[in-house]
Amino acid sequence: MQVTFLGTSSGVPTRARNVSAVALRLPQRSEMWLFDCGEGTQHQFLRSDLRLSQLRRVFITHMHGDHVFGLPGLLASLGLAGSSSAGVDLYGPDPLESYLNGVLRTSSTRIGYPLAVHRVRDAAEQGTLLFEDDDFTVRCTLLTHRVPAYAYRIEQKPLAGRFDIEKARELNIPPGPVYAQLKRGETVTLEDGRSIDGTSLCGEERPGVSVVYCTDTVFCEAAIELARGADLLIHESTFAHGEAEMAFQKQHSTSTMAAQTAAEAGVGQLVLTHLSPRYVLGNPVTPQDLLNEAKAIFPNTLLAKDFLSIDVKPRCNSS
C-alpha cells in the first residue's frame, strides 16, 4: 500500500496546501481508495502521478466543506471521462447521500456509472466491519467533533508466505498457472498424478499492514482504540500545543494530542496533517514547531505536505 497526501490544510487552502484528501494506492490490484475530498481535489490529482481512473472507493470522515466540497465535481469528471465502468462505492455519515443527490440534481449532473452510498454509522456503533474482501478489511469509529465524524482503519489481511521456486523446480513442477495456485496455498494435482500441497512450498504467513485515518477530532479514547498497533496513523494536528484551549473549543487536535494518541495506541509511525492555515510565513509558530512538539512525545513523527507519498510497511518509508 502507498499513501499520497493530496491536501493537508484545515478549513481553507493555502498556496502550499490544499484542503483534506488522502489517496491510498493498492498497486497489486490497480486500485485506489480516497479518504476525504475537499474542494480542488481533482486538480490535485492532475498535479500528481495518481490515476483517477483507478478510483474505486471514497471514504468521507464528516460533512464539513473542507472534507467534502470536492466530491461532486470529482465524481462528475469521472463520468465524463468514461473511466469508471466498475463503479464507485462511497462511505460516510448519514447526510452524504442527500448532499450528493441535491448537488447532482440541481446542477443537472448525470453520473453514468454505478454509484453506491453506504452509511457508516451502524458499523461504528456496533463495532462491525464496514467493508471486507479477500485482501482488506475496513473498520470505523465515531470521533469527538462538532458534527458526526468518523475515523477509518484499513487492515491488509495476512499475506501468503514466499513461494519457494527452487523447491518447486526440484520437484519437477512445470511452471505456469499452477504456480499461482500453489502460491495461494492450494493443493494441486499434476498431470503425472502427484498431489502437491501448496503450503509446503510457501514460507510462513506474513502480516499485512494497517493504516488509520483520524480527522476531525479532539483527543479521545475512541481514536486510541481504533489505532491500536497500526503501522501508520494519519492524525489531524490543527493547532499547536499553546492553543490547546482553542482546540478543545473547536473540537480539534493539537500536535501533542496527536502524538499522545500515537503513543498510547502503540503505532509504528505518526503523520500530522490538517494544519491550520494560520501557521504560514510571518507567524512566529510554524509547522516545524508543531512537528517538534509531537516528536517530543512520539519521535517517529512526520509532517505531511501535499504530494508526500509513504510506502506503508511494518516500518514505513517516506518519499
From Swiss-Prot:
Entry annotated with the keyword Iron: no
Binding, Zn(2+) 1: 62, 64, 145, 216
Disulfide bonds: none
Positions bound to Zn(2+) 2: 66-67, 216, 274
CDD domains named among the record's database cross-references: RNaseZ_ZiPD-like_MBL-fold
Reactions performed catalytically: Endonucleolytic cleavage of RNA, removing extra 3' nucleotides from tRNA precursor, generating 3' termini of tRNAs. A 3'-hydroxy group is left at the tRNA terminus and a 5'-phosphoryl group is left at the trailer molecule
Cofactor binding description: Binds 2 Zn(2+) ions.
SUPFAM superfamilies from the UniProt entry: Metallo-hydrolase/oxidoreductase (SSF56281)
EC number(s) on file: 3.1.26.11
Active site feature: 66
Keyword Ion transport among record annotations: no
Cofactor(s) named in the record: Zn(2+)
GO MF terms held by the record: 3'-tRNA processing endoribonuclease activity; zinc ion binding
Keywords: Endonuclease, Hydrolase, Metal-binding, Nuclease, tRNA processing, Zinc
General function of this protein: Zinc phosphodiesterase, which displays some tRNA 3'-processing endonuclease activity. Probably involved in tRNA maturation, by removing a 3'-trailer from precursor tRNA.
HAMAP family: RNase_Z_BN
Family: Belongs to the RNase Z family.
Subunit structure comment from the entry: Homodimer.
Protein name: Ribonuclease Z
Taxonomic lineage from the root: Bacteria, Bacillati, Cyanobacteriota, Cyanophyceae, Synechococcales
